[in-house]
UniProtKB/Swiss-Prot annotation:
GO biological process: cell differentiation; determination of adult lifespan; negative regulation of gene expression; neuron differentiation; positive regulation of gene expression; positive regulation of transcription by RNA polymerase II; regulation of transcription by RNA polymerase II
Name under which the protein is recorded: Homeobox protein ceh-23
Subcellular compartments: Nucleus
Family annotation (PROSITE patterns): HOMEOBOX_1 (PS00027), HOMEOBOX_2 (PS50071)
Organism whose genome encodes this protein: Caenorhabditis elegans
Family: Belongs to the distal-less homeobox family.
Annotated CDD domains: homeodomain (cd00086)
InterPro entries cross-referenced by the UniProt entry: EMX-VAX-Noto_Homeobox_TFs, HD, Homeobox_CS, Homeodomain-like_sf, HTH_motif
Disruption phenotype: Viable and display no obvious neuroanatomical, morphological or locomotory abnormalities. Lifespan reduced in an isp-1 or nuo-6 mutant background and extends lifespan in the short-lived gas-1 and mev-1 mutants. Expression of the G protein-coupled receptor sra-11 is normal in AIY neurons at the larval L1 stage, but drastically reduced in adults. RNAi-mediated knockdown reduces lifespan in various mitochondrial mutant backgrounds, including isp-1;ctb-1, or clk-1.
Residue ranges: DNA binding: 211-270
Pfam families: Homeodomain
């Protein structure tokens, strides 16, 4: 048997009824709002706008998602829409208020056009790039030229001279120079930390240079008496050393050092004498060998003859 299914009708969406007068009112309201944007109003409070620019108390509501209807229903419900009632007071505002808004908008636009954007260095955090302690770059920098390194890095972060404070219509006249003060503070702090390091290093090197004691200069009489004492005995210790130092007007340590140096000099002299004697002996032996060779050659010549 042939079965016939009943014809089911689907709901058809119809466009919302919109009048041309409501569209005109909406366009006029949008044009009025674009002519006087809220961004150019000095204050964001709506209390200042209520005397001259009152807004509508009712907000239009449009139901874009109607409730579903049964599939076999042929009656399409109409969506009620409240017409938008324009507020004529927006277009008939007080002339003084409109003039004030226009002046504020013109001042804001002219300031943005004449003033350049703030440099990135005034908003960024200043970071001094100092090489690490163990790196080879740090070895090339001593404490004395740390100031030069800091000034080179800060010169790259400072704005050019054309954007320095004092120029008309510049960003730095309206915004306090917080970035410049921060950079100056960082420079002062870095220099305050680098100067003591340089002073400490200089003092340390000066102490190392002064650590070596001055050489004692002995007088002629002192040297002669010490030489006479050294010829008699090469080692002077104990009470004898103290008595000798007291007699010569020296300290026991000075006497001890003089004898040490004199013994070293004596040993070097002995070594030089030994070397010289060995060289003389070798030269004498070589001379004797040559004479013997000459005599043997003469004897050989006589035998041949």
């Amino acid at each position: 048997m042939d079965t016939h299914l009943p014809f089911q009708t689907l709901p058809v969406s119809t466009p919302l009824p919109v009048s041309s007068s409501s569209l005109t009112d909406v366009l006029q309201t949008i044009a009025a709002l674009q002519a006087c944007p809220t961004s150019c109003i000095p204050s964001t409070s709506t209390g200042m706008l209520s005397p001259n620019l009152p807004f509508s108390a009712t907000i239009p509501r449009v139901n874009l998602f109607p409730p579903s209807q049964p599939a076999n229903s042929l009656i399409l419900p109409t969506i009620p829409a409240q017409p938008f009632i324009p507020n004529p007071s927006l277009l008939q505002a007080n002339p003084s208020a409109v003039e004030a808004l226009a002046n504020a908008l013109f001042a804001t636009t002219s300031r943005r056009a004449s003033c350049p954007e703030p440099p990135a260095s005034s908003q960024a955090t200043v970071t001094l790039q100092v090489p690490s302690t163990g790196s080879p770059e740090r070895r090339r920098y001593s404490e004395t030229n740390m100031e030069v390194l800091l000034r080179e890095q800060l010169a790259q972060l400072m704005p050019p001279t054309s954007q320095l404070p004092g120029m008309p219509g510049c960003y730095y006249q309206h915004v306090p120079a917080a970035g410049t003060s921060g950079i100056q503070g960082s420079l002062d702090a870095a220099l305050m930390g680098a100067v003591p390091l340089a002073m400490n290093s200089m003092a340390h090197s000066r102490r190392a240079a002064n650590h070596r004691k001055a050489r004692t200069i002995y007088g002629t009489t002192q040297t002669q008496q010490l030489e006479d004492m050294f010829k008699g005995q090469m080692y002077v210790v104990g009470a004898e050393r103290e008595n000798l130092a007291q007699r010569l007007g020296l300290s026991p340590s000075q006497v001890r050092i003089w004898f040490q140096n004199r013994r070293s000099k004596h040993r070097r002299k002995q070594q030089e004498e030994q070397q010289s004697t060995t060289l003389e002996e070798k030269s004498e032996e070589i001379g004797k060998d040559e004479e013997e060779d000459d005599e043997e050659d003469e004897d050989d010549v006589k035998v041949l003859n």
